[in-house]
Design a protein with these regions (language model features):
Chain B
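Short cysteine-rich clusters marking metal-coordination/redox-active sites
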Residues: 241-245, 266
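A boundary/linker detector
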Residues: 162, 181, 185-216
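Short Cys/His-rich Zn2+-coordinating modules
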Residues: 217-231, 249-251
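Short metal-binding segments enriched for Cys and/or His
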Residues: 267-283
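Short Cys/His-rich "knuckle" micro-motifs
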Residues: 248-254, 274-277
Length: 258, 285, 232
């Protein structure tokens, strides 16, 4: 089997004024692989996510994406239209704040259905059936399909955002602190849901988090970032159980029983 | 009525007309795409058809014959004043007959009588942006048009069906033009939407306050958005016109007294009059 | 026959950056080879580095020096230099590890925890569950518990879940870290049977057994792990 990476980044560099936000970052994401980027606030992990997903243009380096057709596209040269098309079909983006990823005034069914309609679904009954199925999968009572997310709890909103993102079966999902604003008990449920869906659908995920426990639960591979650089990377359990870099040791030591 | 002196032909100066014609040409070249133009102050307030008037003024010539309708009627205030305006500043002949007109300026209707090649239908448009209630950021609506990213409009239709069991848009029903641009057909009843599809006449849309012109060239595909299992259906009152008996035309409901009495009449006065005249001719023969 | 797994001059030390860069050597020059169907018990005093060696073999700790050669997909592979993706493949197909403690995943039923490695290897979910259920039942975990997440289970029950998960796929190489530590006599006998059956099928086993009775029953030989001169 000739397997190739979905996303390949080489030598990414980006400065905000004098501050290096990214400094020589390279990484690959393979099909079905969950990669977590951990590091403290300001380490450049969110910037890296934005550069990899084409939202931000780097000063140096390149990001290549291999589409379902097998052709490789440079993420920063493909043009906004192609990037948007990618964003609503083959890619997904789960935001920390569900308000950034949902239409708060549109019903739960409409939120899930939007991505289907954006890629051409035109059968109301089919869209509704699919939305119902996805609400069930993310453990939202399908009877609430016509309620708006404003009437949902934070955890439900985040689960709805995940349903909306995954409904088009993307191959690559970017997640930015998906459990960020939630209570601990709600976090556990969400993490487990993500873990299950990712495994079932064989998704590749790039997860940005400062939650080491979440990274351990979800990620196959871990990248530790500090001051715009990847200081250590490898198998999740090895990086966390046998950290080599001083900063990783500090990070792991700071966590309560990860 | 004599032609007013002291004005250029059709009120606007030639440079302005040229500028507007350039916008119209661009609009015709990109069916359904909104082209900005330098909308002028007109001698009537915004919302009274300043966009349509500027378009008409830019394309009208001495040999044209103008018809103006408001909600289908030739005899309402807005229609009468615009017709008199052009009679005065351009000295062109006017008509109430759809078949005789070369230019028809309209507010909120498409005539029942099918238009033919060579005719031009000018719509007065209050809000040219079909996405404006869904996406408040103007820059973002432009981006959505550029990317043909219209999932949002379908979300609106989905929400309608979820809430009301059917698509509850009765006028200004969104259409796709030439399979590319989403377009607001101005507040015509959804009943009129099918008339836009592959119409032999040129359709021009002018929005004065919003400073936009757009167009549908002759024989261009115009499709009302819908779902496979909830297809678009033009709706009219289930009645016959009280005057001409038409069961095909779009009807206005007229309240006749204070006791709930009402009747249905054709909204298109020319069409209704023609049919009544034909009945009388038949009776006379 | 060539070994299923062997090490060449394997060494491992830890550098504690948070304690002024203190370096703790744990293993050096470890040469261990295990044939298919052979069970080797690691011996040595507590703190000698038995668990560290196991974790190095599994890739949970990075090898400091030397090589770890595993027969994987018909060829020898050096785990000491394998990247993360290759390591995942090795763990999925060739190398199993039963640790002392179950890492509980919230909300996942016991049955699915055991079935998961089977599904990852391509077995249909229902077949994987059936096999998991059979193994759990053999380990005397009542079927009423199969649908529950093991978070609230006793230590012994959790360990049996862990054992079922480790034995279910039939890895060619299996690492056992105190597999019977908190089990009663009946369950120890079951584990004994599992180990013997695995050996008979050609599984190479490396184990740490504090239970000398079990150790003497299953181990073909002992491998002495020598404590490094730590904190020198």
């Amino acid at each position: 089997m000739m397997e190739t990476p979905l996303l390949e980044a080489h030598g990414l560099g980006l400065r905000f004024g004098t501050i290096p936000a990214l400094d020589g970052v390279s990484l690959e994401i393979w099909p079905g692989e969950v990669v977590a980027i951990v590091g403290e606030s300001g380490s450049g992990k969110t910037t890296l996510l934005r550069v990899l997903s084409g939202l931000l243009r780097p000063d140096a380096g390149s990001v290549a994406y291999r589409g379902p057709d097998g052709a490789t596209h440079s993420v920063h040269d493909m043009g906004e239209a192609a990037l948007r098309r990618l964003m609503r079909s083959d890619w997904g983006f789960v935001h920390q704040n569900p308000r950034d990823g949902l239409r708060m005034g549109v019903s739960a069914g409409g939120n899930v259905g939007e991505r289907l309609m954006a890629v051409g679904a035109r059968h109301y009954g089919g869209i509704r059936a699919e939305a119902t199925e996805w609400l069930r999968r993310v453990e939202i009572d399908p009877a609430r399909i016509d309620d708006t997310p404003q009437q949902f709890s934070g955890g439900m909103q985040q689960r709805l955002q995940i349903a909306r993102t995954l409904v088009t079966r993307p191959r690559l999902v970017f997640m930015d602190e998906p459990t960020g604003g939630l209570d601990v008990s709600v976090q556990a449920r969400l993490l487990d849901l993500i873990r299950e869906l990712v495994a079932d659908l064989g998704l590749a995920v790039l997860l940005v988090t400062h939650d080491i426990a979440a990274a351990r639960l979800l990620a196959h591979r871990l990248l530790v970032m500090r001051q715009g650089r990847v200081v250590e990377q490898g198998l999740t359990d090895r990086v966390l159980d046998d950290p080599q870099h001083e900063y990783t040791q500090l990070l792991v030591a700071s966590v309560l029983a990860a | 009525m004599s032609t007013a002196t002291g004005y250029n032909f059709a009120y606007l100066d030639e440079d302005t007309k040229r500028m507007i014609r350039r916008a119209i040409l661009k609009a015709v070249a990109i069916p359904g795409h909104q082209v900005p133009f330098g909308s002028r102050e007109m001698p009537l307030p915004y919302g009274w058809g300043t966009g349509g008037i500027q378009v008409t003024a830019s394309i009208i010539g001495p040999q044209d014959r103008l018809k103006v309708i408001d909600q289908g009627a030739d005899d309402t205030t807005n229609a009468v004043s615009i017709r008199r305006f052009f009679a005065r500043v351009a000295g062109v002949p006017t008509t109430e007959r759809t078949s005789e007109a070369s230019i028809i300026q309209t507010r909120h209707r498409i005539p029942e009588t099918p238009l033919r090649e060579g005719q031009i239908l000018v719509y007065q448009v209050p809000m040219p942006e079909p996405l404006f209630r869904l996406e408040p950021r103007v820059a973002e609506t432009k981006r959505l048009h550029a990317m043909a990213d219209y999932g949002l409009m379908h979300v609106r239709l989905y929400e309608d069906i979820a809430r009301h069991g059917h698509i509850a848009i009765s006028y200004n029903y969104p259409v796709m033009v030439n399979g590319r641009y989403l377009m607001a057909p101005s507040p015509i009843p959804a009943f009129d939407n099918p008339k836009m599809d592959r119409m032999p006449a040129l359709q021009l849309f002018g929005a004065g306050r919003e400073k936009r012109i757009y167009a549908v060239p002759p024989y261009t595909a115009v499709r009302s958005l819908d779902f496979e299992d909830h297809p678009f259906e033009p709706v009219r009152a289930k009645a016959a016109c009280a005057l001409c008996g038409s069961r095909e035309s779009y009807l206005d409901e007229v309240v006749t007294d204070d006791r709930g009495g009402r009747m249905f009449l054709c909204s298109d006065t020319d069409y209704c009059g023609e049919r009544q005249a034909a009945v009388q001719r038949d009776a006379a023969e | 026959m060539s070994p299923a797994i062997r090490t060449e001059a394997l060494g491992k030390s830890f550098t504690l950056h948070l304690q002024g860069g203190t370096r703790i050597p744990v293993l050096s020059g470890v040469d261990l080879a295990v044939e298919p169907g052979e069970c080797v018990a690691l011996a040595g005093p507590s703190g000698a580095g038995k668990s560290t060696l196991m974790r190095c073999l599994y890739g949970n700790y990075g090898a400091g020096s030397g090589r770890i050669l595993l027969r994987h997909r018909g060829a020898e592979l050096d785990l000491a230099s394998a990247d993360a993706r290759l390591m995942r493949e090795v763990r999925r197909e060739t190398l199993g590890y039963v640790s002392q403690f179950l890492r509980v995943i919230p909300r996942v039923p016991t049955l699915d925890i055991v079935a998961e490695p089977l599904v990852a290897r391509g077995m249909p979910r229902e077949a994987a569950r059936a096999r998991a259920a059979a193994l759990l039942t053999r380990l005397n975990l009542p079927s009423a518990l199969h649908a529950l997440p093991p978070a609230t289970f006793s230590g012994g029950e959790q360990q049996r879940v862990n054992l079922a998960r480790g034995f279910a796929p039939g890895y060619p190489v299996l690492l056992l870290d105190e597999p019977t530590a908190s089990l009663d006599a009946a369950n120890r006998a079951v584990v004994l049977g599992l180990i013997e059956a695995a050996k008979a099928q050609g599984t190479a086993i490396i184990g740490i057994f504090h239970d000398t009775e079990i150790r003497d029953r299953v181990a073909d030989r002992l491998f002495e792990v020598h404590p490094e001169q730590a904190f020198a």
